[in-house]
């Protein structure tokens, strides 16, 4: 640009040429912060991503299902508005998935960048439940008020999910979960993405007082189907019939759940048949004679290839065959079994059925690995034996076992004692990041260093 300069009398004139150059690199996605956290439907969709910049750039997607289709060239050194074309593939998986696109200046050193986050649904419809509500379940604002209403609105294998807000729900009878419908709890009642939950919150399902059967059933799923139950507390069962406080068969995955304060004549901590448990806490349950039903089995009955990852089984009481875990043909990784009382004999923390192979890898257990009538696990790699005293140097080192706080103290031997290849989740039961140290911790809770 040319600027003309003169004296006050305008007798002298000269011209000044001003050349403007970019002093500071600039690059940003031209969307609000809320719109930079994008929700995409299960079927996939195309996205136009507007970007303002004054530098050459690179555009990189974090996941293979996010496709960068077109990146217009940057021309010149003035601010330029471009439109980057993005395509999201259909989600054929079991759960919501998350990824991102980073736009940054070209080169190895990043001076300026911006990110578009993408969450993609795994279903076509969500049914909402919130304690005290009275709607039709189509949104949080119009949520159903009871779990029974929410389940009635779902259909088996119907490309649906059931989202239940935090709070306490008193069940009316035994409850069958819908097959192929992921059921999530712990929402505050405003989220539109699964990742936005505060995992310290849970939805509590209280068994009906008159129900003498397991309070929750998950029946066998179709071959190849997996179904998640995540973010719940199951409590209040008083069982004299059936398998245990909760009962699940083939294909179900229980994650970030607590099973506590239940009484049953068998399997008060749950009965699981070809099921996966991840980041679960099972505590303060009692297997004992209940009315005319005589005590049998254990606290947790894991059969037919059930797998446990980072499960904490503590402070339960049994008059059955063992006080902690009864398992066959399964696998137990990064789990702790401690403080479980056997009322009728030796304090058996676990039991292996005859002639069944079971993997025990990087677990911590009190009083010996298993009572098994002469059988042995096919592997006990990395397992440690715990003292019966929580406060001992070789005790579990829970924060306050007496009051039910099973998070870890900084001196706990469970810290960094797990097996990293067995990690099944990037988060623990209350949303803390895994892995925090060099290795994953044993149990449902990851120890986090306080800054």
Which residues does each PLM region occupy?
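A short beta-strand micro-motif common to beta-rich folds, especially ectodomain repeats
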Residues: 1-9, 84, 95-107
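C-terminal edge beta-strand
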Residues: 12-22, 112-124
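C-terminal accessory segments
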Residues: 224, 382-448
């Amino acid at each position: 640009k040319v600027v003309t300069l003169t004296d006050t009398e305008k007798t002298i004139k000269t011209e000044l040429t001003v050349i403007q150059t970019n002093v500071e690199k600039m690059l940003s996605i031209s969307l609000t912060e809320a719109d930079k956290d994008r929700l995409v439907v299960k079927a996939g969709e195309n996205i136009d991503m507007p970007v303002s910049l004054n530098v050459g750039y690179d555009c990189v997607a974090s996941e293979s299902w996010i496709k960068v289709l077109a990146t217009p060239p940057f021309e010149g050194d003035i601010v330029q508005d471009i439109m980057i074309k993005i395509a999201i593939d259909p989600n054929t998986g079991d759960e919501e998935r998350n990824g991102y696109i980073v736009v940054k200046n070209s080169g190895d050193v990043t001076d300026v960048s911006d990110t578009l986050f993408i969450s993609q649904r795994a279903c076509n419809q969500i049914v909402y439940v919130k304690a005290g509500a009275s709607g039709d379940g189509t949104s949080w604002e119009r949520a159903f008020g009871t779990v029974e209403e929410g389940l009635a609105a779902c259909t088996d294998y119907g490309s649906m999910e059931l989202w239940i807000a935090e709070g306490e729900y008193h069940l009316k009878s035994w409850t069958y979960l819908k097959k192929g419908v992921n059921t999530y709890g712990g929402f505050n009642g405003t989220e539109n993405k699964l990742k936005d939950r505060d995992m310290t919150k849970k939805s509590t399902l209280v068994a009906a007082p008159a129900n003498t059967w397991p309070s929750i059933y998950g029946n066998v799923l179709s071959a190849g189907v997996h179904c998640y139950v995540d973010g719940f507390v199951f409590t209040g069962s008083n069982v004299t019939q059936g398998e245990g406080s909760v009962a699940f068969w083939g294909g179900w995955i229980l994650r970030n759940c607590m099973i506590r304060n239940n009484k049953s004549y068998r399997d008060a901590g749950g009965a699981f048949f070809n099921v996966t448990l991840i980041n679960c806490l099972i505590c303060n349950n009692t297997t004992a004679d209940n009315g005319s039903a005589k005590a049998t089995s254990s606290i947790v009955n894991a059969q037919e290839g059930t797998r446990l990852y980072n499960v904490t089984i503590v402070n339960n009481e049994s008059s059955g065959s063992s006080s902690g875990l009864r398992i066959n043909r399964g696998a137990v990784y990064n789990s702790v079994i401690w403080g479980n009382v056997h009322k009728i004999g030796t304090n058996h923390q676990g039991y292996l059925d005859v002639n069944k192979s079971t993997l025990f890898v990087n677990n911590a257990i009190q009083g010996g690995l298993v009572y098994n009538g002469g059988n042995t696990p096919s592997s006990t790699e990395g397992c440690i034996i715990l003292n019966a005293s929580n406060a001992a140097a070789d005790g579990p080192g829970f924060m306050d076992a007496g009051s039910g706080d099973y998070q870890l103290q900084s001196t706990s031997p469970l810290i960094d004692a797990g097996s990293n290849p067995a990690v099944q989740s990037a988060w623990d039961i209350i949303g803390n990041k895994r892995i925090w140290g060099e290795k994953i911790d044993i149990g449902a809770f990851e120890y986090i260093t306080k800054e």
